[in-house]
Amino acid sequence: MLLEQVIYIMCNLEVSKNSSRNKLWSLIFGIQLLIIDQLVKSFFINFLKKTPEIAISIFKYFKISYVWNYGISFGIFNYYYDISNNFFLIVNTIIVLCICYLITKAKKLLQFNAYMLIIIGGTSNIIDRMLYGAVFDFIDIYLIIFNLADLYIFVGTILLVIYYSYYE
C-alpha cells in the first residue's frame, strides 16, 4: 500500500522546463555515482591485481573478485576480446547517446532519473573500455559477477519498467 503510493507520487512528479534545479541535482548525483564507480573499480584493480585468482569472501555467496569482461553481460562474447572491445565501445556509445536524447523528452522525474542512471552506468563502462580495453567486474554474487555501473543500469531499467507500467 505504502509502496504503491510512493510509486504513484514518483511517477507523477513533473519534469518541466522550469524545474532545472531538479535536473541539476540529478546530474550532480549522477556524476557522483560515476566517480564512486570509477574510484571503487580503481581501488579493487590495484588491491587485487597482485593476486587476481583469489576472491575475497565476505559472505557465503558474496565475494569480491578480479574479473575483466571483454564481452557483454554475463561474459557473453568474452573470448572474442580482439574484436569485441572496439565493437562494444561503439555500440555502448551509440546506446548512451540515444538515451541522452530520450532523457531530453522525459516528462516525469522518475523517468528522468531512470534514464540518468542508465546513462551514468553506460558511461562508466565506456570509460573502462577506453582505459583498460575491457570492463572491470568485481561484485561476485554466486554465479553473477558485475560492477556498480551494471547495478546503475539495472536499477534504471527497473525504474523505467515501473514508470511505464504505472504511467503509460
Curated annotation (Swiss-Prot):
Which keywords does UniProt give here?
Answer: Aspartyl protease, Cell inner membrane, Cell membrane, Hydrolase, Membrane, Protease, Transmembrane, Transmembrane helix
In the record, what terms sit under GO molecular function? aspartic-type endopeptidase activity
Active site positions, chain numbering: 137, 150
Query: Could you tell me the EC number(s) of this protein?
Result: 3.4.23.36
Q: Key word Cell membrane present in the record?
A: yes
Q: What's the chief localization of this chain?
A: membrane
Q: What Pfam families does UniProt report for this protein, alphabetically?
A: Peptidase_A8
Q: Name one GO biological process term.
A: proteolysis
Q: By its UniProt entry, which InterPro entries does this protein fall under?
A: Peptidase_A8 (IPR001872)
Q: What is this protein called?
A: Lipoprotein signal peptidase
Query: What is the reaction catalyzed?
Result: Release of signal peptides from bacterial membrane prolipoproteins. Hydrolyzes -Xaa-Yaa-Zaa-|-(S,diacylglyceryl)Cys-, in which Xaa is hydrophobic (preferably Leu), and Yaa (Ala or Ser) and Zaa (Gly or Ala) have small, neutral side chains
Its topology with respect to the membrane?
Answer: Multi-pass membrane protein
Where it sits in the cell: the answer is:
Cell inner membrane
Q: What species is given as this protein's source?
A: Orientia tsutsugamushi (strain Ikeda)
Pathway it acts in?
Protein modification; lipoprotein biosynthesis (signal peptide cleavage)
Family indicated by similarity: Belongs to the peptidase A8 family.
Q: Where are the transmembrane segments?
A: 25-45, 54-74, 83-103, 116-136, 141-161
